[in-house]
Each structure stands twice: as structure tokens, then as C-alpha cells.
Amino acid sequence: MAPRVSVVLPVRDGGPWLAEAVDSILGQTLKDLELLVVDDHSRDGAVDALDRNDTRLTIVPSEGVGVSAAFNTGLARARGTFIARMDADDIALPLRLERQVGYLDAQPEVAICGACVELFAAEGVRSGNRRYQDWLNGCRDPAAIRRELFIESPIPNPTALFRAADLRRLGGYADPDWPEDYDLFLRADADGLSMGKPEGV
């Protein structure tokens, strides 16, 4: 039986952060998921070191080179109604997917759902990054996201949750000479797709 959500996590040399990112997905309150870790030709052994006891986790070798090719490899294997993006150096709070799926279930006119973020770094987060975080977290409803879309991408890429049919119709991630996530969100907007963020995540 197909899972509700397929989480695609492309990674190249995920280092010490990968296991924590994986654990944060497998520890979601929404349990009906699969996690596809797509290995983009890693050399650091982090993918090999993952605990594979959870049957929801699948390691997939990328069919190309680069993050877009790796994500699209996972997208081709994904079985879920929704496709979530995750990065190897991020942590998803436990309610992320439950709240996002609930939001899209309640808002059938919205095709892409993001979430708020809290930036963190070993050396601390600088004031400019704090302002960027505040701007990201202030763009919540579809009207605000569309209004701000041509300033910068209001959907943080590793928080994105897509309706699988819409994402496939858009062709997944392209490989432009600029950020692949921003390119995808601009293509989604041009296609008339709406984007939003739920409260509380």
C-alpha cells in the first residue's frame, strides 16, 4: 500500500548531520511515510553508516549528478500522494508533516506547502540571517507568498511539501544556472499553482 507521504532527501557527503536529519523524519508524528535517501555519489561514508532497521527508509543511488538529478531520481521512485523535500543538514520538527498534510487536505486550492524555519549554526546566527528568517516566517498565506515571490523564494526548500501529481506535471526540479528551488517555485506560480504555510510549524 502506498504511503501518504514520500520524503526525498538528496545527499552528497552528508557528514555528521545526515543521521540526525534522517532521524527527524523517521520520528515524525505522521508515521505513514517512506524516506528515500538518494545518494549523489557520496564519498564520506555517511550514507553507508545509516541505521537501516526502519523499513520506511530506502537508500537509492542517484541516476545523475547534482542535487536536481538526485531529487528527481527519488521522485521517480516515490509512491506517496504527497512529496516532501528534506536536506541532509536540516532537522524537521516532529509535527512538520502532520501539520503540512493537514493543511493541504484542508486547502485543496493550495498545491505547495512550506513551513517556518529556525536557523542554527555552530558559530551562531548573524543579524542579517535573523532578518532573513523573520522575512521567511512572515510569508505565510498564499497572497503574501505570491507578493514576495519576486524578491526571494518565500518557501524554504527543505520545508517544501508538494502534491505529487502537480510536482510531476511540472517535471520536478530542473538544473538551471541558478537556485533550482526558486526556479521550481517560479514555474509553479507561472502554472497557476498556489503556495502556503500552515500555522504552528
Q: Each predicted region: which residue ranges?
A:
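A conserved hydrophobic helix/loop-capping motif in glycosyltransferases and polysaccharide synthases
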Residues: 4-17, 21, 28-29, 38
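Conserved donor NDP-sugar-binding/catalytic core segment of glycosyltransferases
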Residues: 95-129
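A conserved acidic beta->alpha catalytic loop
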Residues: 24, 31, 39-48, 87
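Acidic helix N-cap motif at the loop->helix transition within catalytic regions
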Residues: 16-19, 44-52, 91, 95
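Conserved nucleotide-sugar donor-binding catalytic segment
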Residues: 7, 76, 115, 137-201
